[in-house]
Design a protein with these regions (language model features):
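C-terminal "cap" of GNAT-fold acetyltransferases
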Residues: 112-113, 132-148
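A conserved beta-turn-beta hairpin within the catalytic core of GNAT-like acetyltransferases
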Residues: 64-72, 82, 101-105, 133-138
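Conserved beta-hairpin
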Residues: 34-60
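Conserved beta-strand in the GNAT
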Residues: 49, 55-64, 68-76
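Conserved GNAT acetyl-CoA-binding A-motif
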Residues: 91, 98-111
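Conserved acetyl-CoA-binding loop-helix of GNAT-fold acetyltransferases
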Residues: 77, 83-96
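Conserved N-terminal entry element of GNAT/NAT acetyltransferase domains
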Residues: 1-12, 147-148
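Conserved acetyl-CoA-binding loop of GNAT-fold acetyltransferases
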Residues: 120-129
């Protein structure tokens, strides 16, 4: 049984764990260079983690684009924890975290085309044309709030 815990990164150690996951997923698995992955925007972002017990297994960062628009970026889940709803747990908790602070907030992201259906399953819709980012096909997506 898994015990996933959501947390906003708040220490240097947690940030290092976030960076380690991004390095493993993006640099090692997807062959994106570290220079591209670590783009000097991290200091402008809020970083979030999912723990399984005491091990960090997923991460994402969130950056303000406009007054009420946040961009979810660098979503990464360790390989052995994919298909266990870790990614959706991470994204849903990020959205709830910021909506609790400002109910008028909107969310956008650039999804790799290969995983756009994952984001569609958690109420994101695509808009615009496909484009390449770091040599990988992407599509812009925005979150559609559901009425509660």
């Amino acid at each position: 049984m898994y015990n996933f815990i959501f947390k906003k990164a708040s220490s240097k150690e947690e940030m290092e764990k976030s960076y380690a996951i991004r390095t493993k997923v993006f640099c090692e698995e997807q062959k994106i260079s570290k220079e591209i992955e670590f783009d000097n925007l991290d200091h402008l972002c809020s970083h979030f983690l999912i723990f399984d017990d005491k091990k960090v297994i997923a991460t994402a960062r969130v950056r303000q684009k406009e007054e009420n628009i946040l961009k979810i970026e660098r979503v990464a889940v360790l390989f052995e924890f994919r298909r266990l709803k870790v990614g959706s747990t991470l994204i849903k908790n990020i959205i709830q975290y910021f909506i609790n602070l400002n109910e008028n907030i909107s969310f956008i992201l650039h999804s790799q085309v290969a995983v756009a259906d994952f984001y569609e399953s958690i109420n994101f819709i695509s808009y615009g044309d496909e484009f390449f980012e770091d040599g990988i096909p992407h599509i812009a997506m925005k979150y559609i709030k559901t009425k509660t």
